[in-house]
């Protein structure tokens, strides 16, 4: 089943798309500050592994024009909390174990939101992004197991992951991608382990 969803904000609508295989092993939010051409392919691969996938905008089309919008961690965190509220009210999603796969600039906000909703979010994976920008309080409060995937040439993200890891109290691992390696191999293995655990 496929559905479109929308959340109203003062700055415009946020649109999303739900891919829901039957039966679904769990629900994964694909969290990115703006849609990218690769999103559909990522969602398709995750659904092939049996996961429902919710791809949701975190910024309205109006907000996306502001240069610093993708760095506004408090606003992005609030948007993620609104999405988590939507899931709690939705009959198709509310009973599925929930994970979040964050990409790039969405990562710090995902950590903050998951730390605040520790009974709802069961597992996390991130690919890139400055995870340490989530802040010390959120990093220490996080309980969901976290996989940090980093490209081998992305020294900035790797350094951010190392800084963050020193404060994490949850189960966590870092996976350094080799050149040409598909990050979804590590991500789906991580979700499978922790959804079934």
Residue spans of the language-model regions?
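Catalytic active-site module of serine/aspartate enzymes centered on a nucleophile-bearing elbow/loop
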Residues: 180-197
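A conserved short beta-strand
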Residues: 119-131
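Acidic catalytic loop of the alpha/beta-hydrolase fold
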Residues: 152-157
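Serine-hydrolase catalytic machinery in alpha/beta-hydrolase-like enzymes
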Residues: 7-96
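Catalytic histidine neighborhood in serine/cysteine hydrolases
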Residues: 165-181
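Short beta-strand/loop motif that positions the catalytic acidic residue
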Residues: 142-143, 148-150
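Hydrolases whose catalytic domains are alpha/beta-hydrolase-1, hotdog thioesterase
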Residues: 108-113, 135
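Alpha/beta-hydrolase fold nucleophile elbow
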Residues: 92-106
């Amino acid at each position: 089943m496929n559905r479109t969803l929308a959340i109203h904000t003062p700055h415009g609508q946020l649109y999303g798309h739900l891919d829901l295989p039957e039966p679904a092993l769990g629900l994964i939010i694909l969290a990115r500050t703006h849609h990218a051409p690769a999103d559909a392919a990522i969602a398709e691969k995750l659904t092939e592994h049996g996961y429902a996938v919710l791809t949701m905008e975190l910024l309205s089309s109006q907000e996306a024009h502001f240069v610093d919008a993708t760095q506004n961690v408090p606003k992005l965190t609030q948007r993620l909390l609104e999405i988590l509220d939507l899931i709690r009210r939705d009959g198709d999603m509310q009973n599925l174990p929930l994970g979040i796969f964050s990409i790039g600039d969405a990562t710090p906000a995902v950590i903050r939101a998951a730390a605040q909703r520790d009974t709802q979010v069961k597992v996390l994976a991130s690919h890139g992004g400055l995870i340490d920008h989530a802040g010390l309080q959120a990093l220490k409060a996080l309980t969901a197991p976290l996989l940090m995937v980093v490209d081998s040439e992305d020294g900035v993200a790797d350094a951010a992951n190392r800084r963050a890891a020193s404060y994490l109290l949850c189960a966590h691992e870092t996976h350094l991608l080799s050149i040409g390696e598909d990050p979804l191999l590590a991500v789906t293995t991580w979700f499978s382990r922790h959804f079934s655990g």
